[in-house]
Amino acid sequence: MSSNHGANLYDLSSKLGLNKNELMDFSSNINPLGSSRLAKQAVIDNIDMVSIYPDPSYHDLKLSISNYCGCATDNILLGSGATELISSFINIVSPKKAVLLSPSYSEYEKELSKSNCIINKFFSKKENLFKVNVDEFINFINSDCNDIVVICNPNNPTGFAFSNGEMKKILENTNALIMVDETYIEFTDTNIYSSTKLVDDFDKLFIIRGTSKFFGTPGIRLGYGLTSNSNIKNSINSNLDLWNINTLATIMGEVMFKDDSFIKNSYQTLTSEREFLLKELSSFKDLTVYPSKGNFILSEIKSKKIKASEIREILLSKQIIIRDCKSFEGLDEYFFRVCTLNHNQNSLLIKTLKSIFINE
């Protein structure tokens, strides 16, 4: 199992002799609009708070998240990024058998493997545009004594998403704990696809979110989990460090979730840019482009005249980075993923890709 994170900009920029800001990174799935201006100003205005320990209860941060997600503050757990909560939850549950919706993010399998867990993978199929039939998925879960089901929603890298109605059906018709990673949920219609409002009614549901992607803050390492399961909450909290969220992350979090202007503008802009990229990429006769509810798009080189790794190298020479997806189990060397950047950058990507396919 290989890692399927985005590009390491520090390493790439060093090798190319460039500044990180000179690279157009279509591989990392981070909001190109940056982070909330109000949240950054709050950090500046309160910079002297670094001399004080954070509130160990994180009352104001949890209240901000509660209002944002519509969940009770008592059902919120905080983590140093979503990855810490993924690790903590799987470690606490210590499953013997798990269902993993695949292909997907490598950290899930990595953490499940640490528990010596038998992993039953349900592979979505390209023939179905990577869409998952909820009844087939439920039958797969129930076909074995699985302790836990891991779902990335929307799924990275395929872009498929279960609606919250489908997620409720999964919860009602299975016995396993359900872990849903909603890292990319804000890039789609949360009223249709987010399951946060199911948390208070289903104590077998554990939702994980991070602020790295939509809120453009990978550097502050802030994530949160939502569950009404008291045993899970108490077990995870007892295993986390007392002050696992630093002061700057706390200040930003208290403000960013209330910045409605940033949230609305990001959603509208990136939805529009995703549709632009989907339309333009779909016009390439060499590509099969898969629908997406995330801020990224999975494409397959159906003509097989060139591999994704070769396209990546050509683009890299032009300071453009895309994601070669062969490290995702279930995908081959002809799949690549791009995320949405600003319109000029997206247009340049399309123009450059056209020149590559014309010359092949």
Regions found by a protein language model. Give the residues of each.
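Active-site phosphate-binding strand-loop segment of PLP-dependent enzymes
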Residues: 128-186
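PLP-dependent aminotransferase-like
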Residues: 91-147, 151
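N-terminal "arm"/small-domain region of PLP-dependent enzymes with the aminotransferase-like
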Residues: 1-52, 145
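Short loop-beta-helix segment that forms the pyridoxal 5′-phosphate
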Residues: 54, 66-88
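Conserved PLP-binding catalytic core of the aspartate aminotransferase-like
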Residues: 270-271, 284-318
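PLP-dependent enzyme catalytic core of the Aspartate aminotransferase-like
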Residues: 165, 317-318, 327-360
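PLP-dependent aminotransferase class I/II
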Residues: 35-36, 57, 204-283, 287-290
